[in-house]
């Protein structure tokens, strides 16, 4: 067997293993700010996704005592006062 075939095979294997370990080129996760109010426990059910985004529009992912939750941007205090 010719030596250049062995070198080529080992090099290709090394590149494939390296790419497999890296996975994909992922975007950096956004930093989460603390929520502007401490919401009641009923808001703890509306969780952020794993990439720290909210499914509903006009919602922001923020962290509280119960984890990362989604709060409404447009009416943060109005919905919280309806406890």
Curated annotation (Swiss-Prot):
Domain of life (superkingdom): Eukaryota
Gene name, Swiss-Prot/TrEMBL: Wfdc9
Leader peptide range in chain numbering: 1-24
UniProt entry tagged with the keyword Signal: yes
GO CC terms in record: extracellular region
Location of this chain's protein in the cell: Secreted
Keywords of this entry: Secreted, Signal
Protein name stated in the entry: Protein WFDC9
């Amino acid at each position: 067997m010719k030596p250049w075939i062995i070198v080529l095979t080992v090099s290709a294997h090394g590149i494939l293993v390296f790419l497999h370990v890296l996975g994909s080129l992922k975007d950096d996760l956004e930093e989460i700010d603390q929520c502007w109010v401490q919401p009641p426990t009923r808001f703890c059910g509306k969780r952020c996704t794993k990439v720290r985004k909210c499914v509903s529009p006009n919602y922001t992912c923020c962290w509280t005592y119960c984890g990362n939750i989604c709060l409404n941007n447009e009416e943060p205090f109005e919905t919280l006062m309806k406890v």
